[in-house]
Design a protein with these regions (language model features):
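Metallo-beta-lactamase
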Residues: 88-212
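Conserved beta-strand hairpin/beta-sheet module of binuclear metal-dependent hydrolase folds
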Residues: 2-51, 137-150
């Protein structure tokens, strides 16, 4: 694990043999927030590290972009250690979590809503990434300027703890939003991203990005 910027810890599992880094994050606030759980194998490795950081504290919220193994495959394991944690996700993702019997303790958010707590304030952004291109979510933490990119701004390789620099305009243009199967949805996503002003991109796969210029 690495404190990749102040208050934000990155955990990484590398999928072999393709060398795909899968990152999860803990935002260390008074109400700790876990962003993605990783698959079961990663959660098994991450949970002791979380305990090391948290001490007596418990995870308050778990942010889930969409229903996929690297996003929430380890959720049941995390909830065994943090049973009061609330999964924050889209309505579509919530139906999957409840339908598969993983958890009913969910907070459903719609796009362009604010989800705030003790020392954090997240804005939600529509992300058409669920099955049938239904709606998932991206999360932007406004107080610190951290954008959690999930499967956007995708990169291969072993890149735990590694940060590059880019302008936000260049990051959006190379994010992959315009390659979504539904062209209209991709254009809307690019437009939505252009309206936020992050300082840092916490990547789901690939290098993190410090925004410059």
């Amino acid at each position: 694990m690495t404190e990749i910027i102040k208050d934000l810890y990155q955990f990484t599992e590398v999928m072999e043999p393709i060398k795909l880094s899968m990152h999860q994050y803990l935002l260390m606030t008074n109400e700790p927030v876990l962003i993605q759980t990783g698959a079961v194998s990663q959660a098994q490795t991450t949970i002791p590290k979380l305990q090391e950081l948290l001490g007596e504290r418990k995870i308050k919220y778990i942010l889930i972009s969409h229903f996929e193994s690297d996003e929430c495959g380890g959720l049941a394991l995390v909830l065994k250690e943090h049973p009061e944690a609330v999964a924050v996700c889209s309505e579509t993702t919530a139906r999957q979590l409840m339908g598969f019997g993983i958890t009913n303790n969910v907070l459903i958010k719609k796009p362009n809503e604010i989800f705030a707590g003790d020392d954090f304030e997240f804005q939600t952004i529509s992300y058409p990434c669920e099955m049938h291109m239904w709606e998932g979510l991206l999360f932007f933490e406004k107080k610190r300027g951290i954008f959690f990119s999930s499967d956007l701004m995708f990169g291969m390789g072993e890149n735990h703890g590694q940060v590059i620099e880019s302008s936000w305009d260049a990051a959006v243009k190379s994010s992959g939003a315009d390659t979504l199967p539904n062209q209209e949805s991709g254009q809307k996503l690019s437009s939505d991203l252009s309206e936020i002003e992050p300082k840092f991109v916490a990547s789901g796969h690939g290098f993190c990005i410090t925004i410059v210029g």
